């Protein structure tokens, strides 16, 4: 089986088995919200774009006939729900041009959409520019996936040039750059490092959703690295880390987004936009395109209700909502010196 097809099958198989630390984040109820659903503005500014919704379809797949169909369907979903969408890593098409149409199908189905190309952190400037040209990408994602590469039998073993290449690409390209994790999360030190390279936007993409160490270990004959299935920081911990960074980095979030409530909590934690992948992929494969379009539109309506419930009319006011943390999130913050009391007292009136 093609490696990209294996990834899709394993991601679907493991999807419902993931633990999620969003369950340890509680939003403080506001009995007097003083707003109306009609007043809610879901739009946000992210990666240089104005998005009509605060969530988007994140990088997943491409590089085979099976994944071409998936990308086509995802593009239709994104188009009908007016969502930004990222393709999976286009490295396969850069190595074998015959696979290009498994990615360009996204632009064909969504000609006026905001579409992001995705490449690995070890990619050269020339290849990065090729990736952008492939389907006239509006932005470029560089993914950081060292644990996945190390568990992957055929993966990379040398990451010494990653920082230099990221800096070179940031300087050379003429579209927005997003540096993203692939489900292992980030800490404040990493975000500070990326800021020093000139990066302005990161997707902290934490543990809670698809685990690529788990997926790659399942491809190993002995499956001897199963203990790495939960490697990394959670999405919630990564967002809290990002808020402690010594930079004004723009933060996107992804990893373990199951529903509109998880999106809502990630936005309350400071994300400018939230990426979803595993839930959308699983719903698409189980229920088809039309049902997945309905799910995305349902999330948009649910977000309007959630904003109204706390008295928020836009993302700026949502960032000021009071939150309480428990369990492993609280343990992480105590060990890392992150003050959680300030989050519980962010709303000075009306709570």
Residue ranges and their predicted role:
Residues 1-47, 51, 327-349:
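An N-cap/entry alpha-helix motif that binds or orients negatively charged groups
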Residues 46-93:
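Active-site cofactor/substrate anionic-group-binding motifs, chiefly glycine-
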Residues 63, 136, 287-288:
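Glycine-centered helix-coil hinge/cap
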Residues 68-69, 97, 152-156, 286-288:
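Short, solvent-exposed loop/turn segments at secondary-structure boundaries
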Residues 75-80, 111-116, 121-254, 260-283:
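Alpha/beta enzyme core
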Residues 82-118:
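A gly/proline- and charged-residue-enriched helix-loop-helix capping module
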Residues 262-264, 268-315:
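Shared catalytic-loop signature of beta/alpha-barrel
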Residues 304-334:
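Charged C-terminal helix
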């Amino acid at each position: 089986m093609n490696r990209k097809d294996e990834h899709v099958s394993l991601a679907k198989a493991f999807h419902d088995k993931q633990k999620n630390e969003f369950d340890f984040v509680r939003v403080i109820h506001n009995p007097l919200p003083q707003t109306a659903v009609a007043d809610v503005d879901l739009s946000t500014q992210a990666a240089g774009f104005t998005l009509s919704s605060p969530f988007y379809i994140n990088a997943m797949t491409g590089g085979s006939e099976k994944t071409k169909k998936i990308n086509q369907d995802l593009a239709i979903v994104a188009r009908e729900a007016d969502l930004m969408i990222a393709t999976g890593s286009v490295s396969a098409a850069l190595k074998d041009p015959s696979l290009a149409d498994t990615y360009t199908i996204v632009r064909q189905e969504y000609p006026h959409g905001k579409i992001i190309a995705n490449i690995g952190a070890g990619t050269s400037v020339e290849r990065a520019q090729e990736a952008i040209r492939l389907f006239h990408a509006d932005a470029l994602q560089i993914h950081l996936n060292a644990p996945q590469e190390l568990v992957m039998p055929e993966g990379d073993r040398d990451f010494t040039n990653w920082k230099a290449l990221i800096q070179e690409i940031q300087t050379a390209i003429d579209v927005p750059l997003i540096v993203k994790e692939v489900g292992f999360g980030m800490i404040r030190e990493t975000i500070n490092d990326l800021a020093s390279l000139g990066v302005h936007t990161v997707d902290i993409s934490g543990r809670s959703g698809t685990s690529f160490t788990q997926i790659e270990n399942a491809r190993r004959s002995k499956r001897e690295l199963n203990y790495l299935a939960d490697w990394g920081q959670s999405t919630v911990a990564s967002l809290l880390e990002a808020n402690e960074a010594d930079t004004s980095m723009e933060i996107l979030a992804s990893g373990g987004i199951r529903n509109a409530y998880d999106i809502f909590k990630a936005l309350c934690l400071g994300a400018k936009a939230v990426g979803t992948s595993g839930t959308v992929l699983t719903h698409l494969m189980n229920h088809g395109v039309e049902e997945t379009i309905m799910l995305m539109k349902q999330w948009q309506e649910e977000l309007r209700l959630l904003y109204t419930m706390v008295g928020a009319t836009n993302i700026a006011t949502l960032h000021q909502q009071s939150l309480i943390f428990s369990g492993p999130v609280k343990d992480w913050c105590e060990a890392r010196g992150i003050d959680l009391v300030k989050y519980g007292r962010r709303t000075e009136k009306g709570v």
